[in-house]
């Protein structure tokens, strides 16, 4: 939810849009009034942003953070068995385990746990919708514009959702990579949005 990003400073004269509910994909807004538009996509949002905008880029910068355009893939994303296991075990206890892995350490987990949780049914609908759209995609038939879309990738070396090795496998040779010592949820390691798009 947008609460997760509340601590990040927004530069002056900057509008911030946060897209986070992926039960249906679509973005009807226009970027036309803006001189600069910086995209930061996190986790499965990297796949969503690629899907929505890879063919018609209108961004000053595009940063992929702890995700790839192939989010369910044994060597380039979340291993298929883990993705499916997460989907099939969405419950309060299952989400608690997932959140622990996502947060990586107790301090991050405690801070994240203070936020209002999204309704479990909403999370399940979202993950099922994404799974059904991701499942038929094949690496061989990928749109070649995907590789040129992203300006940089930031990957967390302690990511327990998207293995760092898989993130490296995908991003190596496609764009500059910045590695940070952080869990899958890296936002508490930053103070400002412009740290993510510089």
Task: Identify what each model region corresponds to.
Residues 1-26:
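Conserved HGGG/HGGXW glycine-rich cap/lid loop of the alpha/beta-hydrolase fold
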Residues 55-89, 126-131, 190:
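Flexible "cap/lid" loop of the alpha/beta hydrolase fold
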Residues 71-114:
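Helix-rich cap/lid subdomain of alpha/beta-hydrolase
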Residues 111-140:
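Hydrophobic, aromatic-rich cap/lid helix
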Residues 161, 178-197:
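Catalytic histidine-centered segment of alpha/beta-hydrolase-like enzymes
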């Amino acid at each position: 939810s947008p609460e997760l990003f509340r601590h990040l400073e927004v530069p002056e004269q900057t509008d911030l849009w946060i897209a986070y509910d992926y039960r249906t994909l679509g973005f009807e807004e226009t970027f036309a009034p803006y001189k600069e538009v910086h995209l930061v996509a996190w986790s499965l949002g990297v796949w969503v942003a690629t899907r929505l905008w890879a063919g018609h880029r209108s961004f000053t910068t595009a940063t992929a953070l702890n995700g790839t355009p192939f989010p369910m893939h044994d060597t380039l994303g979340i291993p298929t068995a883990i993705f499916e296991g997460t989907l099939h075990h969405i419950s309060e206890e299952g989400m608690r385990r997932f959140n622990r892995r996502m947060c990586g350490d107790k301090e991050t987990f405690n801070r994240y746990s203070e936020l209002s949780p999204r309704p479990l049914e909403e999370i399940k609908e979202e993950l099922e919708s994404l799974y059904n759209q991701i499942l038929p995609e094949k690496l061989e038939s990928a749109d070649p514009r995907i590789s040129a879309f992203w300006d940089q990738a930031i990957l967390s070396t302690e990511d327990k959702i998207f293995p760092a090795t898989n993130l490296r496998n995908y991003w190596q040779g496609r764009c500059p990579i910045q590695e940070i010592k952080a869990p899958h949820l890296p936002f508490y390691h930053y103070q400002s949005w412009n740290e993510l798009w510089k």
